Swiss-Prot record:
It catalyses: Hydrolysis of terminal non-reducing alpha-L-arabinofuranoside residues in alpha-L-arabinosides. The record marks 175 as: Important for catalytic activity, responsible for pKa modulation of the active site Glu and correct orientation of both the proton donor and substrate. It is found in: Secreted. GO terms for cellular component: extracellular region. It comes from Streptomyces chartreusis. The lineage of its organism: Bacteria, Bacillati, Actinomycetota, Actinomycetes, Kitasatosporales. This is Extracellular exo-alpha-(1->5)-L-arabinofuranosidase. One of its GO terms (biological process) is arabinan catabolic process.
Length: 328
């Protein structure tokens, strides 16, 4: 985490093409920001690029485009003590949109420190926020927690604390994301597996409800390539995108300095997602720092849809400098 990260956006044509079959560079998808234009013989005009950074001093961005046509933005605040929310009719409008605090850390006990990586989801007519937090007395005992709000407007109503997401182990865990596929809801997250020679790997489980796992949890990935093990052996920050008969799962790797980067898995949408053998992992990162643009350590991304309702947009955090003083 970093108090000086900035949220940025990119479209498909802003990113270099990666020569790997596992990145699905055919059809209507490409590495980074993906564009889905089914049934169109000629490419649609490309919208103007976004102005970066979109939001300063925020990390781990998440943007939800709601059925009301508005974009809802949340991210890690640099003080790690609250969950914030903004909304706008346009993606660019999030830069200047008013920000509200929808929940604050507890003064003591659980959910009191390291409030990280919130994600806002609309599930079954209610709003949910997944986030990481730790007790005041043990700030690295980080776990995954869930908030629920039944009001149609997430800026109103009451955010009820549904509790901790209980995984197979009581160990360091964070960066939960959720998605549905073929009638089932899944949770994907990062966690330290007892006895493993790494900081965190990626895990997947089906859900009984928005705060409870059900059935087995599987290990999708552990840091194995050199680019996943710089500084720390880390796989974290997963996010899913379903397009063109495949499921793309991006994630972040290595220490959260300028070596931080994005990797990716793909799975056939017709396969069993709970079978690790159905997922293919890219042996190279799909998004890294860039000296030309002076963007370093891109990571913990999400995907949203542009105002045209068709173009997928990659939202990520990065820095404009390499050297870090203090907490990275």
């Amino acid at each position: 985490m970093c108090t000086r990260e900035a949220v940025r956006m990119s479209r498909e044509h802003d990113l270099p093409e990666i020569p790997s079959r596992r990145l699905l560079l055919k059809g209507a998808a490409a590495a980074g920001a993906l564009t889905a234009v089914p049934g169109v013989a000629h490419a649609a005009p490309r919208p103007a690029p976004y102005e970066n950074p979109l939001v300063r001093q925020r990390a781990d961005p998440h943007i939800h485009r709601h059925t009301d046509g508005r974009y809802y933005f949340t991210a890690t605040a640099p003080e790690y003590d609250r969950i914030v929310l903004r909304r706008s009719r346009t993606l660019g409008g999030l830069s200047t949109a008013a920000e509200s605090v929808i929940w604050r850390a507890h003064p003591t006990g659980d959910m009191a420190a390291h409030i990280w990586a919130p994600e806002l989801h609309r599930i079954g007519g209610k709003w949910y926020v997944y986030f990481a937090a730790a007790p005041a007395e043990d700030v690295w005992r980080i776990r995954i927690w869930v908030l629920e709000n039944s009001h149609p407007d997430p800026f109103k109503g009451t955010w009820e604390e549904k509790g901790q997401v209980r995984t197979a182990w009581e160990t360091f865990s964070l960066d939960a994301t959720t998605f549905t596929h073929r009638g089932a809801r899944y949770l994907c997250w990062a966690q330290h597996e007892p006895g493993a020679d790494n900081n965190t790997g990626l895990f997947l489980s089906e859900m009984a409800n928005p705060w409870t796992l059900t059935g087995p949890q599987i290990r999708l990935s552990t840091p194995e390539y050199d680019w996943e093990c710089v500084g720390y052996k880390v796989n974290e920050g997963p996010y899913a995108l379903k397009r063109n008969g495949r499921i793309f799962l991006t994630y972040s790797a290595s220490a959260t300095d300028h070596h931080y980067c994005v990797g990716m898995f793909t799975a056939d949408a017709g396969g069993n997602l709970m079978d690790p053998g159905n997922w293919s992992k890219s042996p190279i990162p799909v998004f890294t720092g860039n000296e030309t643009t002076k963007q370093y350590g891109p990571g913990h991304n999400c995907f949203t849809v542009a105002e045209d309702g068709r173009s997928d947009v990659l939202v990520y955090h990065a820095r404009q400098y390499k050297e870090i003083v203090g907490d990275p």
